[in-house]
């Protein structure tokens, strides 16, 4: 994966900056793809103390796109098929590079003076998958983790990567999924949620009938409510 990265799209806090949300886009998208959702969250609920960071994935060769470059957090070698096959074909190197990137992004916010419990990491599809992995393996306790239409990466070895005393063992995790998702099957997300629950993580799982690989207003409203709950105004 290329080390060259475009600086994230940033929505500064409208008042004193006391919290940060890092929201991560999916394959082929950019941070701009989620700008309108962020603008709605900011406008409707007046999260004036929250800074929103929308990172941009680097342009990398994507196997399912005939090796052509597109924005991606890691390579996708196959779409569809059984879960075991999908896991065997994970781009472990690319995943770990992005995991490090998000850990560094979180640390930058902490270094700027934001308490880690006032940071939420979340995303959609590939971005949600990275958020789950990076969030749960972060050494600082976060305020919350969100995975929309996503799944747990490195699931076969995840249990060996974590321990009961980890900082984010009790961090609230919310996973949302469309029941008609043709790209990341709902069952894959459900298995991920069940695996995490089995390991003792605080995971809430919700599905949306008729929803494909996308986001619907009801889901975005629930994300908004989660952010308000985890990041209430301090001033």
Curated annotation (Swiss-Prot):
It is found in: Cytoplasm; Nucleus. It is an enzyme of class 3 (hydrolase). InterPro entries: AB_hydrolase_fold, LYPA1-2/EST-like, PLipase/COase/thioEstase. Keywords: Cytoplasm, Fatty acid metabolism, Hydrolase, Lipid metabolism, Nucleus, Serine esterase. Coiled coil: none annotated. It catalyses: S-hexadecanoyl-L-cysteinyl-[protein] + H2O = L-cysteinyl-[protein] + hexadecanoate + H(+). The keyword Acyltransferase does not apply. One of its GO terms (cellular component) is cytoplasm. The active site is at residues 125, 181, 213. Pfam families: Abhydrolase_2. GO terms for biological process: fatty acid metabolic process. Its EC number is 3.1.2.-, 3.1.2.22. Hydrolyzes fatty acids from S-acylated cysteine residues in proteins with a strong preference for palmitoylated G-alpha proteins over other acyl substrates. Mediates the deacylation of G-alpha proteins such as GPA1 in vivo, but has weak or no activity toward palmitoylated Ras proteins. Has weak lysophospholipase activity in vitro; however such activity may not exist in vivo. Belongs to the AB hydrolase superfamily. AB hydrolase 2 family. This is Acyl-protein thioesterase 1. It comes from Gibberella zeae (strain ATCC MYA-4620 / CBS 123657 / FGSC 9075 / NRRL 31084 / PH-1).
């Amino acid at each position: 994966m290329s080390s060259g990265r475009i600086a994230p799209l940033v929505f500064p806090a409208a008042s004193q900056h006391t919290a940060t949300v890092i929201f991560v886009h999916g394959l082929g998208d950019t941070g701009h793809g989620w700008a309108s959702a962020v603008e709605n969250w900011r406008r409707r609920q007046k999260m004036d103390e929250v800074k929103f960071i929308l990172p941009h994935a680097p342009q990398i060769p994507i196997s399912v796109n005939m090796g052509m470059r597109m924005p991606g957090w890691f390579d996708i070698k196959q779409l569809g098929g059984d879960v075991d096959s999908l896991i065997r074909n994970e781009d472990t190197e690319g995943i770990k590079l992005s995991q490090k990137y998000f850990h560094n992004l979180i640390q930058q916010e902490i270094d700027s003076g934001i308490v880690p419990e006032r940071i939420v990491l979340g995303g959609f599809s590939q971005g949600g998958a990275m958020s789950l992995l990076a969030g749960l393996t972060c050494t600082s306790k976060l305020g919350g983790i969100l995975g929309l239409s996503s799944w747990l990466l490195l699931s076969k070895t995840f249990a060996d990567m974590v321990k009961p005393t980890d900082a984010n063992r009790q961090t609230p995790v919310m996973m949302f999924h469309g029941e008609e998702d043709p790209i990341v099957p709902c069952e894959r997300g459900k298995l991920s949620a069940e695996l995490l629950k089995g390991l003792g993580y605080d995971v809430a799982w919700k599905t949306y009938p008729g929803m494909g690989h996308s986001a619907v207003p009801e889901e975005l409203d629930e994300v908004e409510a989660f952010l308000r709950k985890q990041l209430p105004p301090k001033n």
